Amino acid sequence: MANQDAAQHDENHLIAERRAKLAARRDQAAEAGGSAFPNDFRRDSLAAELQAELGDKDKAELETLDRRASVAGRIMRKRGPFIVIQDVSDQIQLYVDKKGLPAETLDDIKSWDIGDIVAARGPVHKSGKGDLYVMMGEAQLLTKSLRPLPDKYHGLTDTEARYRQRYVDLIMNPESRRVFEVRSRVISGIRRFLVERGFMEVETPMLQQIPGGATARPFVTHHNALDIDMYLRVAPELYLKRLVVGGFERVFEINRNFRNEGLSTRHNPEFTMLEFYWAYADYRDLLDLTEAMIRDVAHEVLGTTTVEYQGARYELGEPFQRLTLRQSILEYGDGLGESDIDTFDGARATCERLGIPVKPSWGLGKLQTEIFEAVAEDKLDRPTFITEYPAEVSPLARRNDTNPHVTDRFEFFVGGRELANGFSELNDAEDQAERFAAQAAEKDAGDLEAMYYDADYVRALEYGMPPTAGEGIGIDRLVMLLTDSPSIRDVLLFPAMRPSAD
């Protein structure tokens, strides 16, 4: 505690010193009738660009080239006459030329602190160690940093502080910046992949009068002008399928969903999903498309289809394993046999042996799904599609033509984590109405995650929706896999957090 108090005292002292420097600078500018921070500097070079262009040149070649550069960035270190600045691409050194710079500029540079954002213009040289630097012929303070950065050797190591102060994390930790650069490229790669295959990107409502498309507890708000309760969407599914009814045969959306549920390493109340719908296709087409898309995006972003995640290696270039839900239970269920899962009494007894609390309303399909989640899901290490989910737990999926107990639905797993959920869509309006009614009854019985009855969506289906396949892929979890990030908070710029004491 004493060490923390001392550190806080030191930080407060540094902040006070910097505020005094800022006040003096403003006073000086006011007396001169100018601005403390003129906005007239224009950068023409990034650190990485200079390294790519000039890094292989020797000192003599650089002297001959007389390459001049205008650079800008945040001061990360000061070492003798050298100042290391960091821009969006990399770091580069500035050299304080005490002989060539005006006295007033040298005095100004003396007041610069680590964390300040500065600019410099001058010729590019190479040090005796082979490092590029810009000889400062001109120098300018662009922004004064009032708070000191964390220790340069330890960075921002407190995990919670990294999440709460992501701006500092991004300054100090190159790996954090890399994660979010990869995330951006993943989303761009998915968008490119789908557009190249004829899918159209659309936007559907975030605020909905009926939150449908997933079994989840929604966030509720109130629209004052309309005087009605509205909900942040839990999924865009029902609106996207309305578009298929309207004639858009291949649509997708990459956007946020909101679910008023718990926080964990896999769950955040707002998260990014890709959802796409494909008319005149079925879930088997989705299996092939999903496998190709994940493989393609991984190779585009990482340059390889081999992914390292938390000490394990996954090969996305090989055919993904495909098992039915029933097959996976029998394969991974530690001795479970057909009699343990194929009848209601057998499945209920199995749940009791496994310590799974059983609700009276559960049917055989729900029992089987709970058994799968208990004995098989976390063992699905290699890339795996699980198919034929029970109709009871798939209220929006089309029943299988030969076995109506199951649906033409799949989920995709890697490392025991679900990344995608897709199925041949239910396009029978009467069947959909019955399933909505069953879900509404569960909601009336106290199930806060059960779906609402959406009469307008049923009406849309009554106009006729072509055979359609649809899928959702969790972007956050996919990025976790591709960046070896153990928590969803590592791949969200600003994850949900409990309010801090300060």
Curated annotation (Swiss-Prot):
Q: Care to name a GO molecular-function term for this sequence? A: ATP binding
Q: Which residues form the signal peptide?
A: none
Q: Does the keyword Magnesium apply?
A: yes
Q: Per UniProt, what is one Pfam family of this protein?
A: tRNA_anti-codon
Where is it located? Cytoplasm
Q: Does the keyword Glycosyltransferase apply?
A: no
Q: Which SUPFAM superfamilies match?
A: Class II aaRS and biotin synthetases (SSF55681), Nucleic acid-binding proteins (SSF50249)
Q: EC number(s)?
A: 6.1.1.6
Where does this protein hold Mg(2+) 1? 411, 418
Name the top EC class: ligase
The cofactor note reads: Binds 3 Mg(2+) ions per subunit.
Identify the main location.
cytoplasm
Q: Which cofactor does it need?
A: Mg(2+)
Protein's name in the database = Lysine--tRNA ligase
This protein's species is Chromohalobacter salexigens (strain ATCC BAA-138 / DSM 3043 / CIP 106854 / NCIMB 13768 / 1H11)
